[in-house]
């Protein structure tokens, strides 16, 4: 049985070993690049996160100590000042990592990135070309290894003629195609990265800016820094790593397979089995390395989030520099930036420690353990020779040179070892690529969840939406925020083209919410009342390439990298401008100048021409041109003034920006215009002209304005009370203003008189209470005198005359005057007693109330 198996093995030895090599390679590849990290590594990551939070808590407690060194003091100050942000930041990063990880586990759904790349012909051609070039380079590497063995063999035997022949005739000639192939591989790799970047960027940007609803919803759901990183840094990292992935994956596989096959056909009989044993050692050591492997996917995602947070703070500093400078908030902002950097440094320190331990173990195993095993394998034929005489004879034969075989095998084993080492490095790169892929998938899922259509407004299925270019009608439409806060349960009004609507109400009543629903930024909800039907009639965004409804916010948008012409025609492009005026710039610019003259903005054209003249003059002076080559001032045309690019948002005041935004509306001539306090920074005289010109252009105005001087431009009023109610109806500006003046006068009188009335009422109340208490005390004193026992023992009472004397019980006369009333009877005395008791209770009650006051 054993002999039969041995015979079978000897017969099929090559095929069995080759199959074993491939199976072992696939097992090693799967073990190295498995996506899930072990539980021990995750536990270590969680423990390190807890330790990091403990450090922050310790920093909070010890931040008061002023005697520590400067560096620790800065860290503790940062932590103490931002303790809340610390906890929030840690929670956000951890939750985001888990969310992204779960978001990547989209079972049954094809990854959009892979689908996108596989459907691109250029990417496929580049990948195939790269694979062919890698195969050619591997074959050239095998040939170079053989030539290295022959060169060393000729040197050992001192065959200088053969050495020169092999060096110049084979080795140098082989270097020409090898150099060309290496350069071509580098070129195709970079070209592939650019192609992937372009493809993914076009896909995500087209989806992100496909319509206003998607752009607004995603920008509200995600932070600006995250979106910027997803569209720039993440795409760049993904494209670079994806282009290198084939090189990192295919070349080691080809090297391992071809090198092992080459070793199998070596003159040494045990080299095939030794290579298999070496492969088993590699598999076992790779399994051990996996135990200390950090979770590179999680590290990549957390690092990207922290870097985005740090960059967002710097972006906020740049965008809000004036506000921060006026409030003297640079110290607080410095603490914010320092703290975010402190969080990033803490995380990077932990990441570096984890990577350092893993790199030490990897370097020792790859370079020394596998290298020693390869040396042992190569030395077996030399130290265990069965027939030394035959081997000595073989040294003389060029085809069976042991030195050449040793060098060749050693070179092949080194190549195979380095290839396996690249597999281990590939594990890290794949996990990092997976982290970036999860972030991009999360962003793509967010875009899919908020996708919309310019022609279809986001709405509830129970709500009916119709389009009429000459009418805006709300019928039982609730005003509900995205946070499900009900501002108005049901809103109904009807506005036809030619009428003008004024909207007033307190802050937070629903004015801006109405505009957001009308602009398609918020979804249209159905009324919760089942007995009512919600219906919205509104004009489309564009009608025959003309704008049907236009929005002017309080702070207009100004593009800083656009020309003066593009500022006025925004959101139209230059191509649409040329199409509108049949490629006649002079005609179009003349219309723009007429619009600017209506708003007293024609001086901007002169200012732009002056700037162009100054730029050309300074350019000519710097280049020291001759007088004939200098451009004269007349060479600057009006077209050039409209083509200048400036930092419009910073160089123009808010008032000029609002007038320029009004010029946009005049240019587009919409049927309806929503004006949300868009003239708050404009002079009253200019404001009157702006509204008057808008009505002359046939634009129906829907205005939110607090200046009563603009009320006469409207004939309908929509008033919100801030409690969910509203009033809609015709509007008489004169009557309303008259009533408003009377109301203001009445309020002024009330403001002046009511405090006086309240003060008088308070004084009267106090006087009344004091009088009651005084009378009660007087009656009580009189009653106490009547009930005095000395008085009751008197023998006789006389009439109450002022000078009358009475006789005391001792018979002596006294000059004491009697009170001016007679002796009461017993029944009258009892009645008086009862009355005084009740009065006494009332007096006590009043006293207690007075004390409480």
Curated annotation (Swiss-Prot):
| Signal sequence bounds | none
Glycosylation-annotated residues: 33, 39, 162, 230, 241, 267, 295, 560, 608, 620, 647, 836
Q: Which family does it belong to?
A: Belongs to the ABC transporter superfamily. ABCD family. Peroxisomal fatty acyl CoA transporter (TC 3.A.1.203) subfamily.
All copies of the ABC transporter domain together span 472-747
Q: What taxonomic ancestry is recorded?
A: Eukaryota, Fungi, Dikarya, Ascomycota, Saccharomycotina
> Where is the protein localized?
Peroxisome membrane
Q: Which segments carry the region annotation Disordered? A: 33-80, 794-853
What is the protein name given in its UniProt record? Peroxisomal long-chain fatty acid import protein 1
Q: Which UniProt keywords apply?
A: ATP-binding, Glycoprotein, Membrane, Nucleotide-binding, Peroxisome, Transmembrane, Transmembrane helix, Transport
The gene behind this protein is PXA2
